[in-house]
């Protein structure tokens, strides 16, 4: 059975989707990208969007949405953890749960290259774009850049990543490129 926090979250998403933008506008942003030790310690929460649900020995560790959100909220509350990287659905849920206050928030941008598919390297930007990250008041965007010298789709992904870095820079946002 869902606890009250998740019933409220589902109600907001289904009946009042504008509350996501309202919560983003109210969110207290961090004063720096770095924690008190001069480091950026982020929790990565963009793996489920590619169907990667394993954590350790648990093949479906990230399959239960409420358990995942509980674990992410707990991790974000730990000393020294000052940020999260995630897809729109995860970040919006964490935002509605109040877990992103004073946290560095980086949105995942390209999630189209699903593992094991013929279009895996043709990794389209199917999540955030720079304008939506700026509108949400998030600190940056992250993209995955995989190079396959035998796949002609690589060049389109390289070009799209370059364009995304420029668009993030135009909005004065952090760009993270994962090799």
What positions do the PLM features span?
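Histidine/lysine/aspartate-rich catalytic loop segments that bind and position anionic ligands
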Residues: 169-179
């Amino acid at each position: 059975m869902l606890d009250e926090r998740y019933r409220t979250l589902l109600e907001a998403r289904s009946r009042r989707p504008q509350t996501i933008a309202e919560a983003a506008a109210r969110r207290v942003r961090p004063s720096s990208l770095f924690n008190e030790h001069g480091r950026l310690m982020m929790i990565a929460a963009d793996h489920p969007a590619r169907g990667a649900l394993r954590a350790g020995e648990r093949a479906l560790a990230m399959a239960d949405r409420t358990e995942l959100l509980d674990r992410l909220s707990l991790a974000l509350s730990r000393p020294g953890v000052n940020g999260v990287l995630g897809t729109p659905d995860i970040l919006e849920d964490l935002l509605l749960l109040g877990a992103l206050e004073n946290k560095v928030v980086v949105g995942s941008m390209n999630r189209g290259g699903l593992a094991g598919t013929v279009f895996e390297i043709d990794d389209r930007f199917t999540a955030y774009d720079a304008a939506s990250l700026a509108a949400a008041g998030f600190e940056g965007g992250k993209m995955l850049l995989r190079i396959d010298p035998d796949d002609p789709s690589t060049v389109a992904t390289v070009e799209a990543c370059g364009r995304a870095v420029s668009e993030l820079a135009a909005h004065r946002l952090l760009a993270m490129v994962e090799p």
